Structure formats: C-alpha cells, structure tokens
C-alpha cells in the first residue's frame, strides 16, 4: 500500500529505527528508505538474513532494549545520526503476565528505559546534525499511554512514561538543536496485535470505538513520523500525535 501522496526528501539523512525489522518499525524504515534516507534498523535476531524479508537495504544491528551496553555499542557504531525513531517495544514479554512485578518491571525496562537509554546514547551525534529543521527523536507512544488496558499494566505505564519523557527531553535538548516528539498509534496491524485480528470478542470493542472503523496499518503511521522528522515540523517539539482513526476523541 502507498503510504501517502506527500513526498519527503531525506537525501543524505541518517536514520536509526529501533525495532525496524517488523511491524510499525518496518513501515517507518521503508518510508524513510523511499525518501532516500540512509536507514539503519535494529532487531533481536543475530543478523538481517535471519528474517523472512529482505533487509539488505538497511544497516542492521542486533539489539535487545534491556541491554544497556548493547545500546551504547549501537549508538557508538553510527558515523552520524540525524533522526532517531524509538520504536522497539514489546508487551506481555515472553507471553508472561504483566501483573507479576518482575514482568511489569521488564516491560517498563523494554518500553521506557530502553528508549531513554538510546536517546541519551545518541544525543551527541544528534546534536552534531546539520539536518534542516533540526535533528529529531520520534518516540512511539500508544493509546495505552492515555487509556487503561488492564491486560498490559506494565506496557501501559511505560507508554504513559514515554509521553512525559518526550516532553522533558524536548525541553532539555532544544538548545542542542534536537526536537523530540512522539506518535501514539491506535489499533494497528502488527505482530504485537496479531492474536487480536479477526477475533471479534477482542477487536470489536476497539473497532466500535474507532470512528474510522478499521484497523490501522504501519503505512498509516509512517507518514506522521516522516512529517515530525521533516523541516515542515521545525517549530514542533514535545508533542504526541495520535494516529488512531479517532479512537482518542470518541
């Protein structure tokens, strides 16, 4: 599916998309690649060849977001960076119950601490960027940043934290020429939501509340990320943009 009729030119722009090997992250990485950016991605498998899709167009780094040393190594390996997309995330880690304190803690470590560590590790390279409109960090929030989803209390707490982290990084790093924003997807087709798709009891309450009445796709989310990273958004920072088919206003 064509992501949008709006064309962005990111020629020469260096982009890192964490979790860019699948789902929303893969859609974002593809969109930057089509816009002529130099795109690196992370994934949990040892190499790009371990995936069932062709990732040869990207620089690939194996990374788990709970590994602080690996986060630093990935950041240090980059020659330069203009845009960081903190997309990597996981709910119900390993299929376990997030109401168990250890699992809750792991979910927060993956979805909040990992994004903060990666942002901090990349700060100096982003501050050195000459990208028109300034360097950007785009965080992935969620509807669970704002609404209760009782099955994933750790994930929801982490994603709520992402919204506030976005504001604080934006305020603190604006003098360094770094803009920090977030997008908050609604119900989007991905590996994370695969078990819900087509199961009426699970998806119907969300679709009934979504005015646009359908699942979103990674191609719905990617254009919002490219906009926030572009010079068209040069005076926008600290904001979280819902990309949810109207779920948050219904």
Where are the predicted features?
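Short, small/polar-rich loop/turn modules that mediate ligand/substrate recognition or access, typified
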Residues: 174, 179, 236-238
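Conserved glycine-rich cofactor-binding loop
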Residues: 21-22
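Substrate-binding pocket helix/loop in short-chain dehydrogenase/reductase
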Residues: 95-108, 206
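Active-site loop-to-helix junction immediately N-terminal to the catalytic Tyr of the SDR YXXXK motif
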Residues: 99, 148-156, 168
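Short C-terminal tail/terminal secondary-structure segment
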Residues: 2-6, 147, 226, 237-250
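Residue(s) in the substrate-gating loop at a strand-loop-helix junction
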Residues: 142
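Active-site helix of classical SDR
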Residues: 119, 158, 166
């Amino acid at each position: 599916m064509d992501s949008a009729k709006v064309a962005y030119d990111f020629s020469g722009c260096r982009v890192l998309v964490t979790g860019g090997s699948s789902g929303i992250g893969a859609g974002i990485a593809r969109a930057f690649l089509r816009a002529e950016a130099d795109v690196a991605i992370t994934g949990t498998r040892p190499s790009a060849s371990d995936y069932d899709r062709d990732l040869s167009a990207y620089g690939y780094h194996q990374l788990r977001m709970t590994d602080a040393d690996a986060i630093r190594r990935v950041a240090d390996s980059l020659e330069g960076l203009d845009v960081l997309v903190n997309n990597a995330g996981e709910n119900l880690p390993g299929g376990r119950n997030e109401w168990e304190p250890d699992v809750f803690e792991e979910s927060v470590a993956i979805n909040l601490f990992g994004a903060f560590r990666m942002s901090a590790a990349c700060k100096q390279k982003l501050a050195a960027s000459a990208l028109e409109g300034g360097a950007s960090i785009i965080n992935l929030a969620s509807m669970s940043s704002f609404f209760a989803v009782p099955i994933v209390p750790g994930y929801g707490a982490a994603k709520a934290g992402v919204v506030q982290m976005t504001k604080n990084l934006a305020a603190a790093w604006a003098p360094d020429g770094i803009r920090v924003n977030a997008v908050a997807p609604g119900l989007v087709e991905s590996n994370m939501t695969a078990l819900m798709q087509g199961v009426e009891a699970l998806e119907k309450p969300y679709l009934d509340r979504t005015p646009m009445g359908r699942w979103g796709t990674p191609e719905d989310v990617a254009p919002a990320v490219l906009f926030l990273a572009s010079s068209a958004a040069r005076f926008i920072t600290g904001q979280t943009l819902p990309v949810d088919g109207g779920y948050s206003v219904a």
